[in-house]
Curated annotation (Swiss-Prot):
Quaternary structure annotation from Swiss-Prot or TrEMBL: Component of the ER membrane protein complex (EMC). EMC8 and EMC9 are mutually exclusive subunits of the EMC complex.
Protein origin, superkingdom: Eukaryota
UniProt entry tagged with the keyword Zinc: no
Keywords associated with the record: Endoplasmic reticulum, Membrane
Tissue: Expressed in liver, pancreas, heart, lung, kidney, brain, skeletal muscle, and placenta. Expression levels are highest in pancreas and moderate in heart, skeletal muscle, and placenta.
Cellular component terms per the entry's GO annotation: cytoplasm; EMC complex; endoplasmic reticulum; endoplasmic reticulum membrane; Golgi apparatus; membrane
Pfam families, per the entry: UPF0172
PROSITE patterns registered for this protein in UniProt: MPN
Organism of derivation: Homo sapiens (Human)
Subcellular location per the Swiss-Prot or TrEMBL entry: Endoplasmic reticulum membrane
InterPro entries in the cross-refs: EMC8/9 (IPR005366), MPN (IPR037518)
Protein name, entry field: ER membrane protein complex subunit 8
Protein function: Part of the endoplasmic reticulum membrane protein complex (EMC) that enables the energy-independent insertion into endoplasmic reticulum membranes of newly synthesized membrane proteins. Preferentially accommodates proteins with transmembrane domains that are weakly hydrophobic or contain destabilizing features such as charged and aromatic residues. Involved in the cotranslational insertion of multi-pass membrane proteins in which stop-transfer membrane-anchor sequences become ER membrane spanning helices.
Alphabetical list of CDD domains matching this protein: MPN_UPF0172
Length: 210
């Protein structure tokens, strides 16, 4: 599987989703720009080597994550939005309800496998709640790849952020200003369709802090 990186915007929104609902399981989607045909025989990890860059995060649900009808509605709407913006649904993230549980459960593996049907380099990201602090001193994620029909954890010591110092600084600033209170997930959108799950205000806040 190619390398995986998250932009600061994608990482921050994932962190804010968990911060808004600290006592619930939360999940969401990660989107990447549509890939151009790549040249073959590029050296692995060398100049020009391929990697997937998650440019944004779409928060889905909090609390009950296994409601299939709601997931289908979300996937359909988000897939349509992605096509309009030349994006593709390329990853899935989840934070479990129990603090010390950072392993993918059946829901996580099922949704990630569904995404992998349309995007071969799909990543499953689990949020490690034990590493979560208001200062964001360390990345809080474990990245899993689909290999031989199983989801396997990649090197936990690898830096999966495009710019970790920036992501750390901005996520800490957003947590300090309680920006998570304004974060909208798909559950919030279903409660009131005026709630925008693309979170333009948080996107602006991230850009302003860059």
């Amino acid at each position: 599987m190619p390398g995986v990186k998250l932009t600061t915007q994608a990482y921050c929104k994932m962190v804010l989703h968990g911060a808004k609902y600290p006592h619930c399981a939360v999940n969401g989607l990660l989107v990447a720009e549509k890939q151009k045909p790549r040249k073959e025989h590029l050296p692995l990890g060398g100049p020009g080597a391929h990697h997937t860059l998650f440019v944004d995060c779409i928060p889905l649900f909090h609390g009950t994550l296994a409601l299939a009808p709601m997931l289908e509605v979300a996937l359909t709407l988000i897939d349509s939005w992605c096509k309009d913006h030349s994006y593709v649904i390329a990853g899935y993230y989840q934070a479990n309800e129990r603090v010390k549980d950072a392993s993918p459960n059946q829901v996580a593996e099922k949704v990630a496998s569904r995404i992998a049907e349309g995007f071969s380099d799909t990543a499953l990201i689990m949020v490690d709640n034990t590493k979560f602090t208001m200062d964001c001193v360390a990345p809080t994620i474990h990245v899993y790849e689909h290999h031989e029909n199983r989801w396997r954890c990649r090197d936990p010591h690898h830096d999966y952020c495009e710019d970790w110092p920036e992501a750390q600084r901005i996520s800490a600033s957003l947590l300090d200003s309680r920006s998570y209170e304004t974060l909208v997930d798909f559950d919030n959108h279903l409660d009131d369709i005026r709630n925008d799950w693309t979170n333009p205000e948080i996107n602006k806040a991230v850009l302003h802090l860059c």
